[in-house]
Amino acid sequence: MELLTKPEGAFVVDLGCGNGMLTKKLAEKGYHVLGVDDSETMLRLAEKNCSGISFQKGNAVDFSLKQKADAIFSNAVLHWIDAKDQQKMLDNICHQLVLGGEFVCEFGGYGCAEQVHSMLEKCFAAHGMTYPRVFYFPTIGTYAPMLEQAGFRVEYASLFDRPTVQEGRDGLADWISMFVKTPFLGMDDSLKKEIIWETIEKLRDTLWQEDHW
């Protein structure tokens, strides 16, 4: 959020606003803010959390604005978009900005949660199944040219480690259940639990730290 350079009063879109907590912080910085999310459930929660802020339903790939934005901000969203749709999404984001507009985003990059995904891949294989890599975690070298192709000038990009603590014995299992849904679609619940248990047991020696993952 600190990377935004537009002055107070600028029209800023929070793309993939979720529960609206960051949308609210953008408004507190003096911006005229619009939150956009594809989940009606999240939008209802955002409207409850943020009085006086406007929200609209829209997918990152094809959302449209009545008024072009001075800046578009996005946090922890873009890695959820399929690889095949990434360029289309970036083209659309650029199109929704005024000339000289800013796009500031944070999302999972190359190597994100790789130990977990690699172990899930091995455990799926042990059961005769393929673990689909559904998240998009690019390198800067891959993504910067895509941004430029969309019409952006890349001024700053950084790939950095950011450990996310999962509290308690079941923290990692809960994280997998919450965020890694697609690979388990249609799977018997008992098999799903077995694979998750196998995964966390194999990761225990490297990721478990006394009372958290």
How does the language model describe each region?
Residues Q87-E102:
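A short glycine-rich, Lys/Arg-flanked "PGG" loop and its adjoining helix->strand segment in the class I
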Residues S64-I72:
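A short acidic, Gly/Pro-enriched loop at the edge of an enzyme's catalytic core
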Residues G100-R169, L185:
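Conserved catalytic/acceptor-binding region of the Class I
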Residues F11-D62:
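Class I SAM-dependent methyltransferase SAM/SAH-binding core
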Residues K24-A27, L90-C94, H117, E121:
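A structural alpha-helix within SAM-dependent methyltransferase catalytic domains
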Residues M1-A10:
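Conserved alpha-helix/loop element of class I SAM-dependent methyltransferases that forms part
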Residues A71-K84:
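A short SAM/SAH-binding and catalytic strip from SAM-dependent methyltransferases
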Residues E155-D211:
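C-terminal helical/coil "lid" or tail adjacent to the Rossmann-like core of SAM-dependent
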